[in-house]
Amino acid sequence: MTDNFFHGARVKENTDLQTAINDVDSTVIGLVAVADDADATTFPLDTPVLITRVISVLGKAGKTGSLYKSLKAISDQVSTRVIVVRVAAAGTEDGAKTQSQLIIGGSQADGSYTGMFALLTAEQKVGYRPRILGVPMYDTQEVTAQLRVIAKQLRAFSYSYCDGCETIAEAKTYREQFAEREGMLIWPNFIAYNSVSGENEEFPAVAYALGLRAKIDNEQGWHKSLSNVAVSNVLGITKDVFWALQAEDSDANELNANEVTTLIKRDGFRFWGNRTTDKDEYIFEVYTRTAQILADTIAEAQFTTVDSPLTPANVKDVVSGINAKLQGLVTAGRLIGAACWFDIVDNPKTSIPQGKAVVRYNYSPVPPLEDLTMIQTFTDQYYEAAFASLGGA
């Protein structure tokens, strides 16, 4: 008699399911801000801090610099996770670092990161990767340029102001300094009530863009652009911007034609503009964000697949799982179309024994309906039918 004799019935469970591909969280904001009077325990310098309920820390954000105004603008739009990196205000003594130097930061001798570079460590330190980046009120040209490098490394998208620009012409000229797909330029700023000072003050439009972007992702999806969505709790715009829906020669249209997003008032205040500073393929904000979020969604889902046996069955499961996810996004209206496949040309017999496999997928993102033309025709074709009933009367 064998040792494993059994007289009866038993069930051994296994699964035959594709690995589920979950969406990455696209709503996490990465904010770099200045506030010397902020609570140092809540907001330590040069350290990514996860805030899960922004409104609860407004009282600790101080009154100076940009931290309070930025968090207030974000919280007026959405309740979302915000990763805050607070940097010191620049000193006035000789040899002191400039504010832009402190905000940009870098890698220190001990290997630690300061300034916006601290955002690179956020995922390891607080468990979330920032996807929506901004440095409201301090986004000078050099800060914006470096922020876009950080955005590329994080597969994130950045929003920046046309720093120092007082006119439309200056904003158009400023825009020419940038060419990346990872950023949108905004001009001018909003006016809002500051409950701390009791005055109506200029508030950074970039901070509102960060909050509104997260709100749109939550309510509609990352395939919907920032443009033409009402912004909460603003009272005005800091510069005169002529806009009319049908006006081809408006200020807003001129700014948009030069890839600068502007602000308008119609049924409340809104951002108006869809464009990045890339003039080639990733011309729309949603094109860049779709590419980023799709890439991370597909790649991160393969964590448990890496180092599994490289068999035809496992590769087939990878392809099937990706196709299922892509078709789900198509059905949800977040992609126009998409497909994944295994091509033997990409996988020669010399590669498989080395533990290497390649699968391909493509997709068509959803463009914004930016230019709608309706053809109106004056015709006489309806007269006869309209008056035919009067015949013989």
UniProtKB/Swiss-Prot annotation:
Keywords in alphabetical order, please.
Viral contractile tail ejection system, Viral genome ejection through host cell envelope, Viral penetration into host cytoplasm, Viral tail protein, Viral tail sheath protein, Virion, Virus entry into host cell
A GO BP term here is: symbiont genome ejection through host cell envelope, contractile tail mechanism
The subcellular location is: Virion
One cellular component (GO) term of this entry: virus tail, sheath
What domain of life? Viruses
**Broad class of where this protein is predominantly found:** virion
Classification via Pfam families: Gp18_domIII_N, Phage_sheath_1, Phage_sheath_1C
| Similarity field | Belongs to the myoviridae tail sheath protein family.
Per its database record, what is this protein's job?
A: Forms the virus contractile tail sheath.
Query: What name does this protein carry?
Result: Major tail sheath protein
